[in-house]
Amino acid sequence: MREPKNAKVLSRLENVLVTQLDVNNFSSIKKSVEKAISHFGRIDVLLNNAGYSVYSPLESTTEEQIHNIFNTNVFGALEVIKAITPIFRSQHNGMIINVSSIGGKMTFPLGCLYYGTKYAIEGISEALTWEMQSIGVKVKIIEPGFTATEFRVEEGAGKHYAEYDNLKQKLYEDLLPKLKTATPPQKIAEVILQAATDESDELRYPTGDYVVEWMALRSKVDDATFLATHRKQMGL
């Protein structure tokens, strides 16, 4: 994990090794993989869960924000997968679980950067199944909705434009009630455990309140109808 000092509870558990890993630091990725192999002798499952979001008009974001979110949410995940693949290949066994989001299947206002990273994770994960199957490795995607965690959310650090204020207000009016009834992280953890142990070839695991019904609606109607329905629900 990024800050091992925060892992007091985990460190007390049996058969748990906590190492420092920052997905934006390839050296720390390599060292963590090496320590895991040295300690356990093998690695069975990789869970890619690092990420954060930026909610802002694209025009109000900075170049640094754009690069940082893709570095963490996408390129960091790729680096971890690349570092661990030789281990899985030598074992001819393993599993990659990538945490995506409902935002990897549909979007909400002002989240083009975040949802862009999640759509990337969806495509990367599905494409990886082809090559990973050749070395005995399964790939799974977890697709949670709103989750009750201390998830990092940034606003745009660039210039403010009043033309987007109404959209921003409507977004928070729509999202805040959903956040109050967000899915407990324990339920997401249960789905991750299921994905890791059910021995199926299932690729995607949508989970959480609203997610299944939204995805069902998304698959049943054309883009114009879905977007119009969503705009109407948000009063836009």
Curated annotation (Swiss-Prot):
Keyword Oxidoreductase recorded: yes
E.C. numbers: 1.-.-.-
Top-rank lineage group of the source organism: Eukaryota
Record localization: Cytoplasm; Nucleus
Binding site for NADP(+): 22, 49, 82, 114, 118
Gene3D superfamilies noted in UniProt: NAD(P)-binding Rossmann-like Domain
GO terms for MF: acylglycerone-phosphate reductase (NADP+) activity
Subcellular location, principal: cytoplasm
One of the record's GO cellular component terms: nucleus
Gene Ontology BP annotations: phosphatidic acid biosynthetic process
Keyword line: Cytoplasm, NADP, Nucleus, Oxidoreductase
Active-site residue numbers: 100 (proton donor), 114 (proton donor), 118 (lowers pka of active site tyr)
Record family assignment: Belongs to the short-chain dehydrogenases/reductases (SDR) family.
Protein name: Uncharacterized oxidoreductase SPAC977.08
Lineage: Eukaryota, Fungi, Dikarya, Ascomycota, Taphrinomycotina
